[in-house]
Amino acid sequence: MRTRYCCLFIICAVMLLGEPKNSGQMRSNEDDEKGKSMTTTLSERTWVLFVASADERLLQQITQQQHGRINKYSICDINNVIGKAPAGLAQGWGVVRIESDARLELPEEFQSTPKGRIIIFRGVTQNLHYTSDIQRQELNKRSRAEFEPSNETTAVLIPIGKSLTWWQLAQDQREAHFQTSCKYKGHTTIGLSYVDRVFRKLYHSRYIGASAPYDFLTYFEFNNHKRDDFKMLLNELRDTSRNPEWSYIELEYEIWMKKIE
């Protein structure tokens, strides 16, 4: 039974899929080929921009010029886990999430604003990895939908990067880290008990030209009264005695927000 449930806690792949940006290392030939393959199918994905700024009027101007699904947030807290969040990002800043089937870019006048006035996180969804058809069906059946904006809805954006060592592992070695074994509970088995009350979505930042130290963006939502559950989820995932995959993380910080619109 445990084998059946392994890999179910995967949003759009694995929570930790990505190659560190600006590492100064060359990708392997295998990864280059994967990148070429992905490029041909990106148009089928959902693109996202998380745009953060202390200037609410600027954010309003940005949303007026964008098409697609838009949500608005207010940053409540920032928690550095490994490494640090971008300089200037602070409590009280506004954030907009813009999703579209087409690739998203801000108009040039917004991209050239003074450094620190605006911070952009970019990503795109992919199909599920490391999951069988049966596992996907189970995940779809048990996972909850996004929450409505309200004072009771907390959203957390966690940019994450993995070490070069992870990407030097063979594919089967990486996948083994998601499996339940006699020694480890594993990433997906840990998360399975939370999927009914914590919404999650994964955006990849690899291969899309985003010059950033993170490899992908993990996005969560939950009701405020489930805050302790969410923290328990993170604590379990970060416990390398239960989830050895986390030992390959080299960048991780949490942006806690209120979903207001």
Model-derived features with residue positions:
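Bacterial N-terminal signal peptides that target proteins for export
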Residues: 1-7
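Alpha-helical oligomerization segments
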Residues: 201-261
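Hydrophobic h-region of N-terminal signal peptides that target proteins for export
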Residues: 11-18
